Amino acid sequence: MAEHVRVKGRIIVGLTENIKLISSEGLNEEVVAKVDTGATKSSIDTRLAKKLKLGPVIKSKMIKSAHGNQLRPIIEAEILLAGKKIKTEFSLADRNHMKYKMLIGVNILKEGFLVDPAKK
């Protein structure tokens, strides 16, 4: 993984980042995630979550998306982003038709990250 620069204690990330999903089953997987400052909650593809045996579903929540409002299952999962381990909530969504199987939202970014769109 590339070296991440810090500014005033915050880690600089780009519009896409390599993420390691950490499964309690030991089925960890690295994926490229899209960073989305307009998304309140992070999201994982339903099939990827099932493959890694992530879960259980802790609640359901109404999520606003480009496709309108959707009631989505919410799980708690752990990731490694830029060397920082974070455990937080993710909504499950069908992202199979999308380029990125994971979306990093504000709930993760507020854990000490800044987004630089020019960062490669």
Label for each model-derived stretch:
Residues M1-K120:
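Pepsin/retropepsin-fold aspartyl endopeptidases
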